[in-house]
Amino acid sequence: MNNNTTAPTYTLRGLQLIGWRDMQHALDYLFADGHLKQGTLVAINAEKMLTIEDNAEVRELINAAEFKYADGISVVRSVRKKYPQAQVSRVAGADLWEELMARAGKEGTPVFLVGGKPEVLAQTEAKLRNQWNVNIVGSQDGYFKPEQRQALFERIHASGAQIVTVAMGSPKQEIFMRDCRLVHPDALYMGVGGTYDVFTGHVKRAPKIWQTLGLEWLYRLLSQPSRIKRQLRLLRYLRWHYTGNL
């Protein structure tokens, strides 16, 4: 029988990743023995692997995060290629966030939401309360000034939040989480990018079949042809993968 409260780690180009078998494994790992882990969750895909390679500040930020997991199918395939016995699957960050929120609602875990447009954040709060009765102890949209950061950190600390999710895009959200943890270390932090927009229906996600086939990237490209430059950049990652430079 598999022990879902532990997980192996795998290394890709110096980055250590948690190997979750599936979503249930991820949840059981994070809520091991009924105690929510503390630290920072960071989703890793091919684009982020390239950024880590090219940007020393981002590399330092992400290396410091305790829980780095394979969000992109390319990363999962690279892990399986380098470690043929690895039982690792993609855990999409947007799905993990929703499952965390559902679990938090069930257990009464206090949650603080950061980021997004004011109207999107308000809709996210309302939907979380209606759908899972999430105990939201505070929120702040992404439109705050740099001089307001410290006061926000203090608000988060005073709220007693055990989960803090930050939708500011990378690397802004990683910088925010690093700095906030200096004031409020006893929580699980998660960078969620554009998840609030998807959750509230402002941005359409790829249909399940595209996700299952590992073609979510292609769906996004067809929906947003302007992403072509970003996709072409990923050819470098494919070279790493197919030449075994992992």
Swiss-Prot record:
One of its GO terms (biological process) is enterobacterial common antigen biosynthetic process. Keywords: Glycosyltransferase, Transferase. Pathway: Bacterial outer membrane biogenesis; enterobacterial common antigen biosynthesis. It catalyses: UDP-N-acetyl-alpha-D-mannosaminouronate + N-acetyl-alpha-D-glucosaminyl-di-trans,octa-cis-undecaprenyl diphosphate = beta-D-ManNAcA-(1->4)-alpha-D-GlcNAc-di-trans,octa-cis-undecaprenyl diphosphate + UDP + H(+). Pfam families: Glyco_tran_WecG. Its EC number is 2.4.1.180. InterPro entries: UDP-ManNAcA_Trfase_WecG (IPR023085), WecG_TagA_CpsF (IPR004629). One of its GO terms (molecular function) is lipopolysaccharide N-acetylmannosaminouronosyltransferase activity. It comes from the Bacteria. Catalyzes the synthesis of Und-PP-GlcNAc-ManNAcA (Lipid II), the second lipid-linked intermediate involved in enterobacterial common antigen (ECA) synthesis. NCBIfam families: PRK03692.1 (NF002980), wecG_tagA_cpsF (TIGR00696). HAMAP family: WecG_RffM (MF_01001). Belongs to the glycosyltransferase 26 family. PANTHER family: PTHR34136, UDP-N-ACETYL-D-MANNOSAMINURONIC ACID TRANSFERASE. This is UDP-N-acetyl-D-mannosaminuronic acid transferase. The lineage of its organism: Bacteria, Pseudomonadati, Pseudomonadota, Gammaproteobacteria, Enterobacterales. The gene is wecG.
